[in-house]
Amino acid sequence: MKIYTTYFSNVRNLSANIVPISISGKAPIGWKGLQYKKLAPKYSFFSIWKETQDNDYYIEHYNSEVLEKLSVDNVVNELITLSECSDTIALVCYESPEKFCHRHLVAKWLSQNGYEVEEYNKES
């Protein structure tokens, strides 16, 4: 399986064979695509981060409250099932590639556990 990350504004540029899956807490109005909420940040620490912009706080809480509670292999298997066995998916959230976003933490977690992940960078 090939896993990309990207942001909602770039979904329109994804190749046709890539299945986009939102991993945000709340997808944009009008989003008709797939959603996988288990990787979404918890409101409790997300709201504090929105006020403080303390990335270290966010990383600590995202890791302990989200990623450490999940099995990476189970997550990948659930994403495969959700995507109807597509061999290429894109995990989608809001921020552009250079901005802080939990999808970068997800990508690191997946990579550290043997899955190849990269930011989808084709833009039209």
Regions found by a protein language model. Give the residues of each.
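Residues lining hydrophobic/aromatic ligand-binding pockets adjacent to catalytic sites
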Residues: 1-124
